[in-house]
Amino acid sequence: TRFDVGIAVYSHNQLYGKWYFRKAGNYPKTGRSLRMELRGEKRSALLYSASEIEILRPEEEPDHPYLGKLGPDAVDPDVTRAEVLAQLEDPRFRGRNLGALLLDQSFVSGLGNYLRSEILWWAGLHPSWRPKELDDEDREDLARWILDVTRQSYETGGITDCLERVEDAKGRGVPF
C-alpha cells in the first residue's frame, strides 16, 4: 500500500492476517495479535496477525525480495491487455500450465485460486493447457479475461458472474 507521504507498507498476511477499519481507539474483541495501527483523528486501520510488515521508501520497492519480483497488477487500471499478452508470450511463462501459471505472482500479481478458476471458466480453457498451445485469439481472450474478471471482482466485492445476470437474479429474490 502506497501513501502520499512517500512511503509504502508491505504486509504479508498469509491466510490469517486481517484488516479492521474502525473508529479511532475502538479495538475489536479478538484473540489475534495487533501488528500495526494506522490512526487518524476519527478512524483507524488495524492489521492483526500479519506474519511480516515492512515500511519502504519508493526507491526500495524494486529491490525488495518479494515486491521486486511481482508481475503486472491485474487490478491496476494502467495495466493493459498488451502487457498481459506479453507475459503470456514470454519464454518464462509460455510453457507452463495455466492452472499453475495464474497463481504465479511473477506472471500477473493479484490472482488467487478462485480468480484463477473463474478466469479459466470464462475463457473456456483447461488448466493443464499452456500458453504456447493456444492460438492468438485464445491468448488475447485470456489476457482480456484476466483483467476483466479480476477488476470486476475487485469493484463488486467478489462478484465474477455476468452483472446483468446477477441483477436479474437479485430482482427475482435470489440471495447474493
Label each residue range with its predicted role:
Residues 2-7:
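Glycine-rich loop at the start of a catalytic domain that most often binds anionic cofactors/ligands
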Residues 9-110, 115-122, 130:
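Phosphate/anion-contacting hairpin/loop surfaces
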